[in-house]
Swiss-Prot record:
It is found in: Secreted. Optimum temperature is 50 degrees Celsius. Active from 10 to 80 degrees Celsius. The keyword Transmembrane helix does not apply. PROSITE patterns: ZINC_PROTEASE. Gene3D superfamilies: 3.10.170.10, Neutral Protease Domain 2. Inhibited by 8 mM 1,10-phenanthroline, but not by EDTA or PMSF. The active site is at E170, H273 (proton donor). This is Protease PrtS. Its main location: secreted. It comes from the Bacteria. Its EC number is 3.4.24.-. The gene is prtS.
Length: 371
């Protein structure tokens, strides 16, 4: 049976919103519930088509130049909203509009300059974003070829355009959709989330010209409102340590296969936002081992793995790891290959000596947890 992938990917997972709903005041529950219900419907529906949104996914027009279009939903939920800033227009004066415009360019430039990729689809796809979606909507998501940003409530989350890596993360879901199109459940779904975290973080580092040891490796560093106990939504450096707050709860991400969360499919699509901490940590390990700018070696290994025809849509952590080792060797040398093997081994995923030359992904093997 052909599995049709869910092309809607949200930044804030249901379990965070459930914690906020449980712990917030009665007066705040309605807004939280609206975001929670919407997020869950986006994750669980395999196909969502609405007549009031732009379908930017089948645009075959080839362009060599950046084209951004920013829309304002005016706190409604009809998409795309009103066009308020198109390519080449001056600053709008609305911080959300201008942040989206600026960081869409930063993401485009990252993929163009580092990977010679022409927008998300490598064909010059227009970048479309809608801001001010919903009333105090507490999420951002990628769907049907566009970005959507909520304003947050100002008490838990700030406006979702404040973090460049959030925009880089969600647009990277578009790149994944146009390449490996990893199925958004279980380990392949966790890799989908992790790869978006990886490239979102690299967009920030590239924009700030940070080396691996200078970066925070935090996703959504500017998102948490004043008074919330945390540094962001996820930490690639220390999975599970991003936040510990009375409203948000404690970050449940593991950083090692020993702590892998075996969730059912109805719980975060099998833990896609949770178990992504394991490959996140593996990438961080490699970036630190190699030093310098993380996009130059570690990033290129991950990107070439994403493009590999042997990467199955239902891949596992181990299968993905094998391919990263293959590309580390093919792109660089034995030292980088060994660093890649060691980085996965440190999170409990062991690429065996007899496996490392295969480079093929059958999508069936299970991650080995013994080190």
């Amino acid at each position: 049976m052909q599995i049709q992938n869910n092309n809607y990917k949200g930044l804030i997972p249901p379990y965070i919103l459930q914690n906020i709903y449980k712990n917030t005041s009665e007066s705040e529950k309605d807004n939280v519930l609206m975001t929670l219900n919407h997020t869950q419907s986006l994750m669980l529906d395999s196909v969502i088509k609405t007549s009031d949104s732009i379908d930017n996914t089948d645009d075959e027009v080839v362009s060599d130049t950046l084209h951004r279009s920013i829309y304002d939903a005016k706190n409604e939920t009809k998409l795309p909203g009103t066009l308020v800033r198109d390519e080449g227009d001056p600053d709008n004066g609305d911080v959300a509009v201008d942040n989206a415009y600026k960081y869409l360019e930063a993401t485009y430039n990252f993929y163009k300059e580092v990977f010679n990729r022409n927008s998300l689809d490598d064909k010059g796809m227009k970048l479309i974003a809608t801001v001010h979606y919903g009333k105090e909507y507490m999420n951002a998501y990628w769907g049907r070829g566009q970005m959507v940003f909520g304003d947050g409530d100002g008490k838990v989350f700030n406006n979702f355009t404040t973090s460049i890596d959030v925009i880089g993360h969600e647009l990277s879901h578009g790149v994944i959709e146009k390449t490996a199109d990893l199925i958004y459940f279980f380990q392949s779904g966790a890799l989908n989330e992790s790869i978006a975290d990886v490239f979102g973080s690299l967009v920030r580092q590239h924009y700030l010209k940070q080396k691996a040891d200078e970066a925070s490796w935090v996703v959504g560093e500017e998102l948490l409102a004043k008074g919330i106990k945390g540094v962001g939504i996820r930490s690639m450096k220390e999975p599970g340590k991003a936040y510990d707050d009375p409203l948000l709860g404690k970050n449940p991400q593991p950083g090692h296969m020993d702590d892998f969360k075996d969730y059912p499919i109805y719980r975060d699509n099998g833990g896609v936002h949770v178990n992504s901490g394991i490959p996140n940590k593996a990438f961080y390990n490699l970036a630190i081992k190699l030093g310098g700018y993380a996009w130059e070696k570690a990033g290129k290994i991950w990107y070439n793995t994403l493009l590999d025809k042997d990467l199955a849509r239902d891949t596992t952590f181990l299968s993905f790891a094998k391919l990263t080792v293959k590309h580390a060797r093919d792109l660089f040398d034995e030292d980088v290959e060994k660093a890649t093997i060691d980085s996965w081994k440190e999170v409990g995923i062991k690429v065996k000596e007899e496996d490392k030359d295969k480079g093929k992904d059958e999508g069936k093997d299970k991650a080995e947890t013994k080190v």
